[in-house]
Amino acid sequence: MKKLYLKTHGCQMNEYDSAKMADVLKFSHGLELTEDPAVADVFLLNTCSVREKAQTKVFSELGRWRPFKEKRPHVVIGVGGCVASQEGETILKQAPFVDIVFGPQTLHRLPDLLDSVIQKRKSVVDITFPEIEKFDRLPQPRAEGPSAFVSIMEGCSKYCTFCVVPYTRGEEISRPFDDVIAEVASLCEQGVREITLLGQNVNDYRGLMHDGQVADLALLIHYLAAMDNIERIRFTTSHPSAFSENLIDAYAEEPKLANHLHLPVQSGSDRILAAMKRNYTVLEYKSKIRKLRAVRPDISLSSDFIIGFPGETDADFEATMNLIHDMGFDHSFSFIYSPRPGTPAAQLPDDVPMAVKKERLAILQNRINAKAAEISQSMVGTQQRILVTGPSKKYPDQLSGRTENNRVVNFNGDTPLIGQMVTIKIKEARPYSLWGEIC
């Protein structure tokens, strides 16, 4: 049996895409995943271009793979994802031993691309944006545990000045409503109990229904919540400007919708938000969160922050810290700004000194970590309903799952509990998890 070695950089969308790559190549070529590159026949790198030095990271990884091909010339090396979409033929110029370059929207063509390389021994590049064809050409979904990701849309049409996603994944395209329902139903039949809906701006979802009507994310959630086997629904990532009243109503009406929201704000300064072209103000962001908390008072809120965007002053950063205090974020993905090639912000002077960026990042992360620890400590003594997803990564002799507010809980239990909803009494708050006992 031939082997596939697959490495993934980046977000949950990339994790979802990587799973589909493995599925489509298993279906077409019988490739089995391996964690040992020494025995692999096909190497795939699914890339992300969001963070700094993304291209350098890709070529470093490819450099580590090159000796495997030199030893075993039949090996095929492919590069997919957003860096592939952004760089295209440049990857072949810098790493001529690469055989396949493909974008996020063309992963369904991997079998044909692989056949072409095997037959002609010539590199191929396919980084087009063929609408939503990708989803129509993939095998039936395959569950791996009680929790699953389901991509409901692709791309982004917001064109924030710092972001490469519209250029690497294309503009927003929503999957047809019935296709999403069918995929979730298939996963349910395989034992999935928790669904996380994915999209670059998932709350911009507009799926065509069979009767010609268009469903938004809130309506999709209502339909999924009506499925008996679904216990919990999550979604990520949202854009504040598209966070609608309908979605707030869904939080009020659907208890299966998890008590957690990730809503990236990026900055607490209106001036910086305008420079980022985020299309909302701090007041508008706060207003949406207040409306949400009116129906879900104890909802957990996480966010993204970019530190040191061009022109960010001490006053701008202080405004961000004030927003963090007011909103009570208990988790964040925060990182130092670095220009992404091809974006409007890359034309701006990167004028915030690196030492200042690092200092601000440390201040922000310390504040949010302190709030997270406070919330975790407040959960000690409470009873929490969790979905048991499998053995704990840190404590393999224990089981693990997540709370409504997205915290990892480890506890002693038997393997048959995996895939079940159980109630745990929290006994201890640890730095990155909770520990408890079955009630």
Curated annotation (Swiss-Prot):
Q: Which cofactor does it need?
A: [4Fe-4S] cluster
What keywords are assigned to this protein?
4Fe-4S, Cytoplasm, Iron, Iron-sulfur, Metal-binding, S-adenosyl-L-methionine, Transferase, tRNA processing
Instruction: Answer whether the UniProt record assigns the keyword Amino-acid biosynthesis to this protein.
Output: no
UniProt binding sites for [4Fe-4S] cluster 1: C11, C48, C82
Q: What is its main location?
A: cytoplasm
Among Pfam families, the record links this protein to:
Radical_SAM, TRAM, UPF0004
GO BP annotations of the record are: tRNA methylthiolation
Q: Which reaction does it catalyse?
A: N(6)-dimethylallyladenosine(37) in tRNA + (sulfur carrier)-SH + AH2 + 2 S-adenosyl-L-methionine = 2-methylsulfanyl-N(6)-dimethylallyladenosine(37) in tRNA + (sulfur carrier)-H + 5'-deoxyadenosine + L-methionine + A + S-adenosyl-L-homocysteine + 2 H(+)
Question: A cellular component term (GO) from this record?
Answer: cytosol
What InterPro entries does the record tag this protein with?
A: Elp3/MiaA/NifB-like_rSAM, Methylthiotransferase, Methylthiotransferase_CS, Methylthiotransferase_N, Methylthiotransferase_N_sf, MiaB_methiolase, rSAM, rSAM_horseshoe
Q: Start and end of every Radical SAM core domain? A: 142-374
Source organism superkingdom: Bacteria
Give the MTTase N-terminal domain ranges. Answer: 2-119
Principal EC category:
transferase
**Which ranges of the sequence are coiled-coil?**
none
Query: Which residue numbers delimit the TRAM domain?
Result: 377-439
What this protein is reported to do is described as: Catalyzes the methylthiolation of N6-(dimethylallyl)adenosine (i(6)A), leading to the formation of 2-methylthio-N6-(dimethylallyl)adenosine (ms(2)i(6)A) at position 37 in tRNAs that read codons beginning with uridine.
Family according to the record: Belongs to the methylthiotransferase family. MiaB subfamily.
**What interactions and quaternary structure are annotated?**
Monomer.
Kindly provide the name given to this protein in its UniProt entry. Answer: tRNA-2-methylthio-N(6)-dimethylallyladenosine synthase
Name of the gene: miaB
